[in-house]
């Protein structure tokens, strides 16, 4: 398989339902990515799939295309009731569920299949109103799905297609019992099409596939390299005292069009936000306690380009489909080596190049050996001149409600470069 972003395989080459092909081509999707080219022949033949591919390689469109085709090509279960969806797509986070729903809308519009969305933290009655009118494809997080199921707002007895997206993250967040609860209320595995996708598929995820799927075919793209080959990786060793100034200096000299900065704690994210906002950057903050409506607004502003920088905990590392992220900064090296892969996977997506810069400080440098062992290579080290770090920095802002703040639009040119030669 070629390592280019797209293969020579076209969606129109497959025996897909004409309405699905029409919807894909209307959105500009003509050629398959490698994971799509591997998955579609299997799902079109009714085979279950457990797929591993790096983020940004088209996993979402692979399972959406398969789901819509299957439902259009197979009749609904006899005597199906209005509260019985035909397909269930489970995601680990609210943001990912919302994005999958958005990606599915063009296909729903073209095919007439109805979508439903179920996630916690917001919109209970609004979501329920849609479900009560009847949906074909239900996309959601496990907690809200179980809530609706226990109250009989939904019944899973007519499910024909099941998708688990970011399955390893489901384990990380402790949702495996919820997943099994939902599976027990569906028809047997051999009476439905089952798909599981993730950037990493650990032994425990393969065990789940064996348990809940029907002889799933395991497929993977570029297994020998866990980090995208279009992502330039770079590592610095700052002292704790120089770490913030190094970050701000790097931002000034890189001048990223769109960057995500990851830190390991909510407090650290707020600290970074305060420094960057005070320095005039258009920066948003995304941590676990930000209200759902505000989270979606921040992501929308970042996607539109109204924000240049997003500071986030790992709540934003998995599954977010934000286009054209040019830089990822690991202000803290993550404690979980898999999170390193998912963090830097926010850049270098859809065939574009990207740049990942990590700071191995005194506190988190101990995480580096496990990360490099996991990704299978050493991260190239760059040096900096401590005397050239920025010093003309304003006092950081203190976070007050609302939790996001936009500095003025960045104008002019970056400050002079400050790296050592």
Curated annotation (Swiss-Prot):
Binding site for ATP: 53-60
SUPFAM superfamilies the record matches: P-loop containing nucleoside triphosphate hydrolases (SSF52540)
Enzyme class, first EC level, given as a word: hydrolase
Compartments in which it is found: Cytoplasm
Region called Disordered, residue ranges: 392-421
GO biological process: RNA catabolic process
MF term (GO), any: ATP hydrolysis activity
Taxonomic lineage: Bacteria, Pseudomonadati, Pseudomonadota, Gammaproteobacteria, Enterobacterales
Family affiliation: Belongs to the DEAD box helicase family. RhlB subfamily.
All copies of domain Helicase C-terminal, residue ranges: 245-390
DEAD box, short sequence motif: residues: 165-168
Presence of keyword RNA-binding: yes
Boundaries of every Helicase ATP-binding domain copy: 40-219
InterPro entries to which the protein is assigned, alphabetical: DEAD/DEAH_box_helicase_dom, DEAD_box_RNA_helicase, Helicase_ATP-bd, Helicase_C-like, P-loop_NTPase, RNA-helicase_DEAD-box_CS, RNA_helicase_ATP-dep_RhlB, RNA_helicase_DEAD_Q_motif
EC number: 3.6.4.13
Protein purpose: DEAD-box RNA helicase involved in RNA degradation. Has RNA-dependent ATPase activity and unwinds double-stranded RNA.
Family annotation (Gene3D superfamilies): P-loop containing nucleotide triphosphate hydrolases
Protein name: ATP-dependent RNA helicase RhlB
TM stretches of this protein: none
Motif (Q motif): 9-37
Residue stretches of biased makeup (Low complexity): 402-414
Complexes and interactors: Component of the RNA degradosome, which is a multiprotein complex involved in RNA processing and mRNA degradation.
Main location: cytoplasm
GO cellular component labels: cytosol
Keywords noted in UniProt: ATP-binding, Cytoplasm, Helicase, Hydrolase, Nucleotide-binding, RNA-binding
Chemical reaction(s) catalysed: ATP + H2O = ADP + phosphate + H(+)
